[in-house]
Amino acid sequence: INYIHPDFRGVNNTKNACCSELVIADIDAAIDYAIVHGNVDTSKIYVTGRSGGGYATLASFMKAKHKIKKFAAWVPLADLAKWYDQTKARKLKYSAEILLCTSSLNGELNKEVAIEKSPMYWKTPAEKFDYSMLDIYVGIYDGLESNSPIPITQSINFYNKLLQDMAADSSAYITDSVKLKLLEYEKPLGDYGKIADRDICFVKKYKNLGITFFTGGHEMLQQFAFDELMK
């Protein structure tokens, strides 16, 4: 097994960070390096990350050049523009960092750049689902405390966006009713089993795309995440 953990462009508070084209190129370059210098089975390349790493995982799925077997995004960010409003309303430090990474001036968000850096607004490469899997994992309590800063609606809206771009049947979507129940009840909506030692609150799957909500916060269940990638 070859494990690479590139730093990309550092903390997400500069114009070159926050899933810029340079970050996407860094991900591709890191994989290229591993292929050249490691004993790599190119049919078994995986990308995973938590939080900002989950954001990068979604960006990699949308734009990276390699044929990846599986992407797993844990508690990811998908919409930088909307997250600015969410973090500003909650007076979290991230709102100031978003201004920095979007070249914003005078405390006003440069929305054009924020959208450019948001997978939510990118074209979906639907053909990738012919050979790649994308799983999104969401802690049901995320977005409720300062140390759990990304609302679950970020993942829900991105999941539904992919379905829309794939012209999926309406039954595949997470409905507004389910979204409201997840936000209100913060507990399993049925018997969906467990991941690791956590109850699954809700799960949805369409072809090679899946989303799982579990009892937890802004976290990755590391052993489960590794084992699931290796399947």
Task: Identify the residue ranges that each predicted region occupies.
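Conserved alpha/beta-hydrolase
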Residues: I1-N13
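Active-site loop signature of alpha/beta-hydrolase-fold enzymes
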Residues: R9-V11, D79, E219
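Short, solvent-exposed loop/turn and secondary-structure capping segments
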Residues: K15-C18, A59-S60, K82-Q86, S146-I152, ...
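Alpha/beta-hydrolase active-site loop
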Residues: C18-G38
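Primarily recognizes the serine-hydrolase "nucleophile elbow" in alpha/beta-hydrolase
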Residues: Y33-L92
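Mobile cap/lid helix-loop segments that gate and shape the active-site cleft of serine hydrolases
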Residues: K69-K70, P76-L77, A81-K128, K181-G193
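Short, proline-enriched alpha-helix->beta-strand connector loops that line the catalytic pocket
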Residues: K117, E127-L134, K205-L209
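C-terminal catalytic histidine-bearing segment of alpha/beta-hydrolase fold enzymes
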Residues: Y137, G143-S146, T153-K231
